[in-house]
Amino acid sequence: MPTPPFERFYETHRDEIYRYLVRLLGRGGAEDAFQETFLRALRGYAGLRHAENLRAWAFTIATRVALDERRRERPAADLPELAARDRRPAYAELEHLAGELPRTERAAVVLRYGYDLAYADIASALGSTEDAARQAASSGVRRLRRKGIR
């Protein structure tokens, strides 16, 4: 499958990538990360050989940019709590609940249950193995259940 023009790729994925970055970084951090995500995507887009899973590729870039941003920020204990920003109630609730998880678990839970990505795609986004992605999502869900969240 040939890759669509970058403009179409951007139009198709920008909103959900922005929401994802807001979930991970808060609104202030998401602005710069969003720009950096699509700048990196633009740089690499011409080199793509096929367009089988551009969505997962975009999430991979966004996750790596978010992790880079987090490394430059304050320690995790000082991170602001995420607020419900998405208008869809299920996503808003997931965003709120996942905000209490460690970064990797939070990303895995949001990508799996918020965006319905396959574990292989989550692994690619996190820079880990599929088993590690599955474990991170599972640990996140277990941690939420221990807090009484079903």
Residue locations for each model-derived region?
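Short, small-hydrophobic-rich alpha-helical interface motif
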Residues: 17, 21, 30-41, 61, ...
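A short pre-motif secondary-structure segment
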Residues: 108-112
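Arg/Lys-rich amphipathic alpha helix in sigma70-family domain 2
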Residues: 46-50, 60-80, 87, 146
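Acidic, proline/glycine-rich intrinsically disordered inter-domain spacer in sigma factors
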Residues: 1-4, 8, 72-99
